[in-house]
């Protein structure tokens, strides 16, 4: 225990005089404590005699005894961290009220040590520990500041404490101390601010306390820990749309600083800077700004690094950036396609695969040149190779990508040649609505405007695999789902309108298909009788499924249902059946 109990012995001179002035109970406590210290390895200082002896010193009016008690608590708790009760915490909280900086420093240290334990964190706050800790944070003594902020940092890791800390008045002094010249205080303060960013309400309190400009200014700090805490805190703050708008209007240097940190020698700083950019890129303005700030060369390098969390952060970021049409060509020119295709082999990370496919889908959405580049990079072949054996989430993304690609007439010949129909048909058996619907939409679009040059691909897949296009049409006609019925009817109509004798014969001569069409027509006819006239309407609507999405913090996938495209599915179904029957004669 050494120095922490220096006043317990007979120091001679003033010390001897002090000892003569001690009360009887204090002398007894000192004597008992010295004996306990001699056998410290066998003593539980948090109960019975040892705790009573320490408490006696705490309540003494003698400052030397208070210091000894505080130092003893600090050293004991450093070596023995476990759940304690109110009887242990109460004397430490009393010491926290002292005006003596040495007592304050040691008491804050002891409380911070005990605040490593979850139960202790809750009890310290319940017993009113925040108020004296906030006072000590504002001390002029650096050591007291450091220990007080460190304790708050530990307390803020407990979810139940966070809102209490946010409302306690602690955020303003924490923000001020984040600018301290002492690196220990800076680390503790920025760490505490980070711990306060895990809920929307607390993030708003933090923004209101003026923490954002301080966090942004500290991104250029030379200390990797401070950089990490600040980038992570800003990343969490950027989860909220209202905060992103505020950042856009008040922090013009933020994106440039984060882009610079993607080159940090610290992988965790790199990762958090990239995640912060990913969250900012939930907004279209930031999607463009990140590219203008030179973010693409950094991101494309990170996609091929060996640190999986960093790869995940980078591919999630580029997924959001790729949503903006102005960025599509720039991303392809920056060399992203091959790394993105390579990430599809990341079989131990569904998230990486999903983000990679979604990015490829975004890039293919609007440009023939981009789609051609996508094909040349091997994206379609790789997706086709993997789609039947990847997890459902990845399968959903790939099927959505297929649906987008199949919309493009310029790409259809290449898709036929890749034998993509061989995987689309099995995917239409999926019990997952998105996978089934996306795959059916892709298959339907491949069946539209079939040229004589490519009719053989339809004929070859008419009955295979898995009963082929024929089986797909029957299943969807009999599905009972208006969406799936519509896809089947639309596909049949497109095949007939291709005016290919062989394909038309396959439909006209198939009694099951004809029966399915007539049954749907009959079931809708009575309902729709009053809504249709003497002539039928025509439709050139493609079957689409666009599920480009922005994701923030957590990885989510959104998709648009085909059913939402039609104001009245029943009218649409009836009209389709009438058009088909008219062609069939």
From Swiss-Prot:
The keyword Repeat applies. A lipid is attached at residue 2 (N-myristoyl glycine). GO terms for molecular function: identical protein binding; protein-membrane adaptor activity. ARM repeats lie at residues 39-76, 77-116, 118-157, 159-198, 200-239, 243-282, 284-323, 325-365, 409-448. It is a lipid-anchor. GO terms for biological process: autophagosome assembly; Cvt vesicle assembly; establishment of organelle localization; filamentous growth; filamentous growth of a population of unicellular organisms in response to biotic stimulus; hyphal growth; nucleus-vacuole junction assembly; pexophagy. Coiled coil: none annotated. Residues 531-562 have a biased composition (Low complexity). Keywords: Lipoprotein, Membrane, Myristate, Palmitate, Repeat, Vacuole. Transmembrane segments: none annotated. InterPro entries: ARM-like, ARM-type_fold, Armadillo, Vac8. Residues 531-565 are annotated as: Disordered. It holds the Pfam family Arm. It is found in: Vacuole membrane. It comes from the Eukaryota. A lipid is attached at residues 4-5, 7 (S-palmitoyl cysteine). One of its GO terms (cellular component) is fungal-type vacuole. Belongs to the beta-catenin family. Functions in both vacuole inheritance and protein targeting from the cytoplasm to vacuole. Vacuole inheritance has a role in the regulation of hyphal cell division. This is Vacuolar protein 8. It comes from Candida albicans (strain SC5314 / ATCC MYA-2876) (Yeast). The lineage of its organism: Eukaryota, Fungi, Dikarya, Ascomycota, Saccharomycotina.
């Amino acid at each position: 225990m050494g120095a922490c109990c220096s006043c317990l012995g007979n120091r001679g001179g003033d010390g001897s005089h002090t000892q003569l002035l001690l009360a009887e109970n204090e002398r007894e406590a000192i004597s008992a404590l010295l004996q306990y210290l001699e056998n410290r390895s066998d003593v539980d200082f948090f109960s019975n005699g040892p705790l009573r002896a320490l408490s006696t010193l705490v309540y003494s009016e003698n400052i030397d005894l208070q210091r000894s008690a505080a130092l003893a608590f600090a050293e004991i708790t450093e070596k023995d961290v476990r759940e304690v009760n109110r009887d242990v915490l109460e004397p430490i909280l009393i010491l926290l009220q002292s005006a003596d900086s040495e007592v304050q420093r040691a008491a804050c240290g002891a409380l911070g040590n005990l605040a490593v334990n979850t139960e202790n964190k809750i009890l310290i706050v319940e017993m009113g520990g925040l108020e004296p800790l906030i006072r000590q944070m504002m001390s002029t003594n650096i050591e007291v500041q450091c220990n007080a902020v460190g304790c708050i940092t530990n307390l803020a890791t407990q979810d139940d404490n966070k809102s209490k800390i946010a409302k306690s008045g602690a955020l303003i002094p924490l923000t001020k101390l984040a600018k301290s010249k002492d690196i220990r205080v800076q680390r503790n303060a920025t760490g505490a601010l980070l711990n306060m960013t895990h809920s929307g309400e607390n993030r708003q309190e933090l923004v209101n306390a003026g923490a954002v400009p301080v966090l942004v200014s500290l991104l250029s700090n030379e200390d990797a820990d401070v950089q990490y805490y600040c980038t992570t805190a800003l990343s969490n703050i950027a989860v909220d749309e209202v905060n992103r708008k505020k950042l856009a209007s008040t922090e013009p240097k933020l994106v440039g600083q984060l882009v610079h940190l993607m080159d940090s020698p610290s992988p965790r700083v790199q990762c958090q800077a990239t995640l912060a950019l990913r969250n900012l890129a939930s907004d279209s303005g930031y999607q463009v700004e990140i590219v203008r700030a030179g973010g693409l060369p950094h991101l494309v390098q990170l996609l091929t690094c060996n640190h999986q969390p960093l790869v995940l952060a980078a591919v999630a970021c580029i997924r959001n950036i790729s949503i903006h049409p102005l960025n599509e060509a720039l991303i392809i020119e920056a060399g992203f396609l091959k790394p993105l295709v390579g990430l599809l082999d990341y079989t131990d990370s569904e998230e990486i695969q999903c983000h990679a496919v979604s990015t490829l889908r975004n890039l293919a959405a609007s440009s023939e040149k981009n789609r051609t580049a996508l094909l040349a990079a091997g994206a379609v072949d790789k997706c086709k190779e993997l789609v039947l054996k990847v997890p459902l989430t990845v399968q959903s993304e790939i099927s959505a990508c297929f649906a987008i690609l199949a919309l493009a007439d310029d790409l259809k010949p290449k898709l036929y040649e890749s034998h993509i129909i061989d995987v689309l048909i099995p995917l239409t058996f999926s019990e997952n609505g998105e996978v089934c619907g996306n795959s059916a939409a892709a298959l339907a679009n491949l069946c539209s405007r079939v040229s004589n040059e490519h009719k053989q691909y339809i004929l070859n897949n008419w009955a295979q695999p898995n009963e082929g296009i024929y089986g797909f049409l029957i299943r969807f006609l009999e599905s009972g789902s208006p969406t799936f019925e519509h896809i089947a009817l639309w596909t049949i109509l497109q095949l007939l309108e291709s005016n290919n004798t062989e394909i038309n014969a396959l439909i006209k001569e198939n009694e099951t298909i004809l029966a399915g069409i007539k049954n749907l027509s009959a079931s809708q006819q009575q309902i729709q009788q009053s809504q249709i006239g003497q002539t039928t309407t025509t439709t050139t609507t493609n079957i689409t499924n666009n599920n480009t999405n922005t994701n923030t913090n957590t990885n989510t996938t959104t998709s648009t249902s085909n059913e939402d495209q039609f104001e009245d599915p029943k009218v649409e179904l009836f009209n389709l059946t009438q058009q088909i029957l008219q062609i069939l004669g």
